[in-house]
Amino acid sequence: MNAFNKLVKHSKKISNFNHLSSIVGWDQAAVMPSGGAEARSQAMAELSVHIHGLMTQPQLADWFAEAESETLNIEQQATLREMKRQWQQATVLPEALVEAQSLAGSKCEHAWRSQRKNNDWAGFEKNWAEVVKLSQEEAQIRAEATGKTPYDAMLELYEPGATTEQLNRVFSDVKTWLPSLIDVVIEKQSSESFIAPKGHYPAESQKALGLDVMKLLQFDFNHGRLDESVHPFCGGVPSDVRITTRYNESEFVQSLMGIVHETGHARYEQGLPKHLAGTPAGEARSMGIHESQSLFFEMQVGRSPAFIAHLAELAGKHFSAMNDPVFRVENIQKLYTRVQKDFIRVDADELTYPAHVILRFEIERDLMNGKIKHTDVPELWDQKMQAYLGLSTKGNDQNGCMQDIHWTEHKSIMSTAKHDYKNGCLQDIHWCDGSFGYFPSYTLGAMYAAQFMASIRKTIDVDDVIRSGNLTPIFTWLSKNIWSKGSLLTTDELVKAATGEVLNPEHFKNHLKSRYLG
């Protein structure tokens, strides 16, 4: 067996353990009782250490050296490149740091779920301080190994090839036109009337509706399922994709579009090249490309008038309210394209969402580069919310910096005024697991999605296809140009091969103006 095949075999062994980790992660978020948290954290930490050990075995260096001198075809060369990239990322971290991060992240994430509800920044901060410290250690180690800045080194984990310089340029441009566009659209919509859902929409009916929409989007139920969790996500593995949503029985709009979004993630996973399964080349290209697929489904397809006609019909059927004006197509369209400034990222509309992302990008960039301290975050959050959306989280961090979970697991300016942490810096799950460098993927994904749709429209009558209820031509394009490519190409190569150009944010800007200004 040559060195390349030894590496592929070893990669598939690692993939099997990652498979277990992913399914157990879904279980922890969706069905595990709270009493299982401590033991689960220990088990997950042990598994993380074992996987890290497999990825850093000493013989791998020799195998990579040998494989690089072997005669390989283009696909094998790309597979070798991706295996080596992941190996290099793993070997720079000491095992003790990997274990410490897993333990700190699990502890922080579990506590965050109750701390956010209670607006408990003080309690959260005690756990998060350790996550931030360990993530900064990781960022510094990666920076020294790659010659990048600490934040760029973390970006590489989610967006290979992306740099702070590129993101600063793209997001700085967005900040020149987005705030004024938001204000213009809000003013335009102020004279429009709509009917908000009122009444009782049972979770069982919402789930049945969601399953029907997943069928319309051609989700493969032989290789996936829908469940419920506090924070909607797509997990599992390509052969067993797990997506979740959350239900609010006083309305159905959020959970339904959340299912459309997560189905986009799932279809990408289910469409990855099966002959490369178990190797990095058979995985998603980047988180930005992953988000492009969920946002393509949600924003480009899901909020189009043609698709909303299907949603209106299905919703009316499942809630036995075909004559209810709430379910008229034009009303559902207004509900899904309504623009308003809000504290919560996951509830934000398409137009204001980039402002939430840019705020988080700027904070995590400066946090990883050591320009700010973790105790500065609530005050900075409030300043940026006021600058970008005209909202203040003083007296409010639950809908601010405590809303996302990503910063708590991976990886001092305190105002005397009481903050609403729940609606501010406590709202996201991302920072709970130390996923510093992830947030830009959301807006990059929206930009890629708009660019893909612009390209598809050159050869396909998208609106007619969606109206027909058979979306196969659209999915065939995505499969041919995105899904089946896995990580064989770099992000720039993938986007250029699919659309004829690398990322061009103008497509996103044009899409927003067309949809919201007509």
PLM segments and residue spans:
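Active-site recognition of the HExxH zinc-binding catalytic motif
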Residues: 254-274, 291-295
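All-alpha helical catalytic cores of prenyl diphosphate-utilizing isoprenoid enzymes
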Residues: 171, 175-178, 203-207, 213-227, ...
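C-terminal, non-catalytic "cap/extension" segments appended to globular domains
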Residues: 3, 22-25, 35, 39, ...
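A well-structured
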Residues: 1-160, 513-517
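Contiguous, non-catalytic segments that form substrate-binding/exosite surfaces or channel walls
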Residues: 101-252, 501
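Post-HExxH zinc-binding segment in Zn-dependent metallohydrolases
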Residues: 283-324
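Divalent metal-coordination and catalytic microenvironments
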Residues: 7, 143, 261, 294, ...
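Secondary-structure capping and boundary motifs in well-ordered enzyme cores
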Residues: 39, 100, 127-130, 170, ...
